């Protein structure tokens, strides 16, 4: 269960019991269960079903924060602007990006635009980033997929891009969504980039690419 979200009047939203900047208790915004519930809805609305959620996303995936607030308030009678802003600001994987509010993204509860940083099935084009890419990346999956991946590589499937993780532990956690005992593929990111295969960092620990050919993959030994 994720930590609760609280808000410090000086330093903005944070997760847990005390503000990491001033050690103050802040004001309770959301418990862990509702934080998870709201995060899943916002992720789905921005990535997969904006029209069903009652919002519009542009070609770069952006929608207005205030329009998204209306959508979440319609979905949950307990949700409000502070709950939405808190979920966006404290997401541990950086799933969401907010712009148009300067340095106040972690504090303000109105204005600006929001988008999902990665994971879209709707047709959007995300701009690149200048973040460096590690030499090695990882991908977690179910054991039943090993043979097909060795033969055809990693493909986006229902999403626009393949998602890779910065660490084997993070990849294994992703793999647990598909199997209790997942396997992890090692991705030679250096070789991919040397061959002009584009890899882009999204969020705090996720990297995306169009596909990964088998030549860049090896199975991580347990």
UniProtKB/Swiss-Prot annotation:
Which GO-annotated molecular functions does the record name?
NAD+ poly-ADP-ribosyltransferase activity; tRNA 2'-phosphotransferase activity
Its family remark reads:
Belongs to the KptA/TPT1 family.
* Record-given protein name: Probable RNA 2'-phosphotransferase
Superkingdom as given in the UniProt entry: Archaea
Q: Which UniProt keywords apply?
A: NAD, Transferase
Q: From what organism does this protein derive?
A: Haloarcula marismortui (strain ATCC 43049 / DSM 3752 / JCM 8966 / VKM B-1809)
Q: Does the keyword Acetylation apply?
A: no
Q: What is its EC number?
A: 2.7.1.-
Gene3D superfamilies in the record: 3.20.170.30, RNA 2'-phosphotransferase, Tpt1/KptA family, N-terminal domain (1.10.10.970)
| Gene of this entry | kptA
């Amino acid at each position: 269960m994720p930590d609760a979200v609280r808000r410090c009047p000086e330093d903005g939203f944070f997760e847990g019991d005390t503000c990491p900047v001033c050690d103050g208790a802040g004001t309770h915004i959301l418990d862990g269960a509702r934080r998870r519930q709201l995060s899943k809805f916002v992720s789905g609305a921005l990535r997969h079903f904006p029209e069903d959620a009652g919002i519009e996303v542009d070609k770069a995936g952006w929608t207005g924060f205030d329009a998204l607030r209306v959508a979440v308030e319609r979905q949950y009678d307990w949700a409000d602007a502070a709950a939405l802003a808190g979920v966006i600001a404290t997401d541990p994987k950086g799933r969401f990006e907010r712009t148009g509010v300067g340095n106040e993204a972690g504090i303000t509860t109105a204005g600006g635009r929001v988008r999902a940083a990665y994971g879209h099935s709707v047709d959007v084009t995300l701009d690149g980033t200048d973040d460096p890419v590690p030499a090695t990346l990882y991908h977690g999956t179910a054991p039943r997929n090993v043979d097909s991946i060795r033969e055809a590589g990693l493909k986006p499937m229902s999403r626009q891009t393949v998602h890779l993780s910065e660490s084997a532990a993070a990849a294994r956690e992703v793999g647990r969504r598909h199997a209790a005992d997942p396997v992890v593929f090692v991705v030679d990111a250096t070789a991919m980039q040397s061959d002009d295969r584009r890899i882009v960092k999204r969020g705090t620990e996720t990297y995306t690419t169009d596909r990964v050919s088998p030549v860049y993959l090896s199975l991580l030994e347990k």
